[in-house]
Amino acid sequence: MKILAIFRAKIGVSMSQVLPHIAEEERMAWAKYLTGELRETYLTSQPGVVLDMFEAPSVAELQQEMLALPLMRAGLLEATYLGLTQKPRLAAVIRVAYTHPKTLV
């Protein structure tokens, strides 16, 4: 299942609180990337907000795994997890309708 994770620094968290945890946080993120679990990472125009796209069995399992991250353990981040489902694009629907017209009736 694809899961969008939105990580936000909690209000009042300073960079000096975050810096001691960055090396371990990045090491753990890189390990998730190498296993294919972490698919994409995006920085945003909002300071302190990062978007990560994961592939995981469920939102609940990913939430549990993310509690091991140093910034989460230190209570410096809050996270929102959104399970995503893929819907057929219009072009794909049109293609099916054109090649198999009776399937959409």
Regions found by a protein language model. Name each.
Residues 1-105:
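Conserved, structured core segments of small domains
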